[in-house]
Amino acid sequence: MKIKTDEVTSVLKQEIKNFKKDLQVEEVGTVLEVGDGIARVYGLTNVMSGELVEFQNGVRGQAFNLEENSVGVVIFGDYIKIEEGFSVKRVGKIFEVPVGPELLGRVLNPLGEVIDGKGPLNAKKTRPVESPAPGIAMRKSVHEPMQTGIKAIDAMIPIGRGQRELIIGDRGTGKTSIAIDTIINQKGKGVICVYVAIGQKASTVASTIEMLREKGALEYTIIVSANASEPAPMLYIAPYSGATMAEYFMYEEGKATLVVYDDLSKQAVAYRQMSLLLRRPPGREAYPGDVFYLHSRLLERAAKLDDKFGGGSMTALPIIETQEGEVSAYIPTNVISITDGQIYLQSNLFASGLRPAVDVGISVSRVGSAAQIKAMKKVAGTLKSDLAQFRDLEAFAQLGTELDPVTQAQLDRGYRVLEILKQPNNSPTPVEEQVISIFAVTKGFMDVVPTAKVREFEAFLLKTMREQHPEILEEIRTAKEVKQEAALQKTIKSIVEHFLAKNN
């Protein structure tokens, strides 16, 4: 076959005419200095605040400080491998994380990368980490209960779906335990949970994950972990990543979600470290001036959405660690003013054997009472004030004065109430059983039971109710109120008599 030269020429001319080279213009800067998770970059003149940038070794960062001659970049990842003189290019988008049902049961870092060794994530969608909180028109007032399974909280400091309830207390008072119990208690209720571990030891996070797996709670939970060994920017961004993952289920699937931030004190410390390294002016306790906004923009994302917007909700349980019970420090007062109430745990109550060590006097739920079920409202209505009176009487009795029979009876009942409110870790109680226990103690049925045997009697009472009177429990569970009070009183009275006869 002979090739004609004029044909070759015409084909070549046509190809040359159609040839277009895609020129990609990238704005590239240079690292001037780097250290402690922060880099100062020269040359990115058009970079926008909050925009992602990429270093030549693939590590990403975010433009944080826009200055006259340089840009302060926070580095998400291993900053040790970044050197002076490295090139940095703009990515042209903001920070996003993967979202969707594929994340359930997985352990991720704040960048949305899996760290549990169970294979790739295969998430189909992403959402921006910094997203605005829902507006007033999108919200609905809190009216559905978010049961924690903890008697002291569900009875006296009730939490509703869409609420922000702070858990505050010294180190080792059981703050994380309350949050984990609440997650375990959501089993079978269609609530998606996100647990954000900020600045914790890897071993602590591992044992928490194991506990959730044991209780069958991991299948509806996403774990976001920024360990203590991670650089400050990772600890700073972790809560926002967790909130974004929950927002997907709230907005796009109309589901109820629960997010635990454990704990925001460490996030504030990480943010302070970043701000000081970026040479931002320090304020009170060396925190930057916008540390309030750091937490308010995070916690305002929790809401109960109106039915027009799917009716989903995000309940936030932020945790704050205090030093020596100092609730009036900067970060605790900030978060108390942002949230809809707080559960205050006291170390001396914890040491005295009251667990959970909830200080009912200081603890409050500003919007939760609207979400409490009728049955609980009825039986526990005066419980908080009764306990406050009991504490006053207890202090008075310690003076050694002789007490009249009425005061003594009030004291004795107070001790029995405290026994009922004690609860072991990782064993949340269904709300219908809580109602029975509190009804029995507040109506005086346990006054004849010795204080030392109150918890034994409670176990016997609930076991008998489950086996012989399941219809009463079912009625409370479904109707959410005690309809046949006289019948319930009669039942409990006979169970008390049976217990005393058995133990004498």
UniProtKB/Swiss-Prot annotation:
* Gene Ontology molecular function, alphabetical: ADP binding; ATP binding; proton-transporting ATP synthase activity, rotational mechanism
Query: Which Enzyme Commission number(s) are on file for it?
Result: 7.1.2.2
> By its UniProt entry, which InterPro entries does this protein fall under?
ATP_synth_asu-like_sf (IPR023366), ATP_synth_asu_C (IPR000793), ATP_synth_asu_C_sf (IPR038376), ATP_synth_F1_a_nt-bd_dom (IPR033732), ATP_synth_F1_asu (IPR005294), ATPase_a/bsu_AS (IPR020003), ATPase_F1/V1/A1_a/bsu_N (IPR004100), ATPase_F1/V1/A1_a/bsu_N_sf (IPR036121)
**Residues involved in ATP binding:** 169-176
Q: Which SUPFAM superfamilies is this protein grouped with? A: C-terminal domain of alpha and beta subunits of F1 ATP synthase, N-terminal domain of alpha and beta subunits of F1 ATP synthase, P-loop containing nucleoside triphosphate hydrolases
**GO CC annotation:** plasma membrane; proton-transporting ATP synthase complex
Which Pfam families does the record match to this protein?
ATP-synt_ab (PF00006), ATP-synt_ab_C (PF00306), ATP-synt_ab_N (PF02874)
The catalytic activity, as recorded, is: ATP + H2O + 4 H(+)(in) = ADP + phosphate + 5 H(+)(out)
Subcellular location, in the record's words?
Cell inner membrane
The annotated topology with respect to the bilayer is:
Peripheral membrane protein
Looking at the UniProt record, the site noted as Required for activity sits at 363
Its main localization is: membrane
What are the alphabetically sorted keywords of the record? ATP synthesis, ATP-binding, Cell inner membrane, Cell membrane, CF(1), Hydrogen ion transport, Ion transport, Membrane, Nucleotide-binding, Translocase, Transport
**PANTHER family reported for this sequence:** ATP SYNTHASE SUBUNIT ALPHA, MITOCHONDRIAL
Family (UniProt):
Belongs to the ATPase alpha/beta chains family.
Question: What does the UniProt record say this protein does?
Answer: Produces ATP from ADP in the presence of a proton gradient across the membrane. The alpha chain is a regulatory subunit.
Q: How does it assemble?
A: F-type ATPases have 2 components, CF(1) - the catalytic core - and CF(0) - the membrane proton channel. CF(1) has five subunits: alpha(3), beta(3), gamma(1), delta(1), epsilon(1). CF(0) has three main subunits: a(1), b(2) and c(9-12). The alpha and beta chains form an alternating ring which encloses part of the gamma chain. CF(1) is attached to CF(0) by a central stalk formed by the gamma and epsilon chains, while a peripheral stalk is formed by the delta and b chains.
Its recorded name reads: ATP synthase subunit alpha
Q: What is the lineage of its organism?
A: Bacteria, Pseudomonadati, Spirochaetota, Spirochaetia, Leptospirales
